[in-house]
Amino acid sequence: MKFQSIAAVILGLLGSGCSTLVSKVFPLDDLPVPSGPHAVGTQYFEWVDGARQEPFTEDPKDKRRLAGQIWYPAGVSDDSLRQPYLDYPERRLDMISYQSGLPRFMVAHMQRVQTNSMLNAPLLPHSQKRPLVLFSHGLSGMKNQNTIQAELLASHGITVISVDHAYDAYLTIFADGTVADYRSSDTENRTGDAFWAFRLPQLKTRVADLVFVLDE
């Protein structure tokens, strides 16, 4: 009975359409400040692998296109360069709402969450040979989902590269406005050999994505 009462209160808040109340009940703060001694810089990138056909589309002329993000130890700290957690928030919030099954106004305050990453901040001097971590998100994930960990590593002198595996990510948005939607969900009704016949090519595509990024 107590759970039903709590649920009724939550539903009442949802029904009110009051985003301010929702942000209080379901708070989302700025990302925690990383513990390392260095500031954190970030850059976005887009690459096209001209040697690979895009396996998720039917047009044989489509080449594999990737969007990603890099975090690295920066030489300066400037709060005016801090990036929001969500790029293209208006488009991403629609998809987050759809995937989570929550009304859009319940997730709208995600667009106000700030990271500690400074866009195009200069690289920390003498950091060209620091360790590198390559991050690969899960099915329907996104390149920046583990920004907290990426910033933590970068603040300790480690460079992190993450890529949206196009069509495996929940939504990839390119700088020209085109998108790659999620197309990897057709595994639920497959078992045994049928499952792996469908999934293995996708996994090979992911591995090829990472190899391509490292080569770049």
Predicted regions and their residues:
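Bacterial N-terminal signal peptides that target proteins for export
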Residues: 1-6
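C-terminal motif of bacterial Sec signal peptides marking the signal peptidase cleavage site
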Residues: 16-17
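Domain-level recognition of soluble alpha/beta enzyme cores
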Residues: 21-133
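Divalent metal-coordination and catalytic microenvironments
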Residues: 70, 153, 210
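Short aromatic-enriched loop/helix-cap "lid" or pocket-rim segments at secondary-structure transitions
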Residues: 81-83, 172-176
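Short substrate-entry loop that stabilizes the transition state in hydrolases
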Residues: 116, 122-130, 135, 139-173
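Alpha/beta-hydrolase active-site loop
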Residues: 178-216
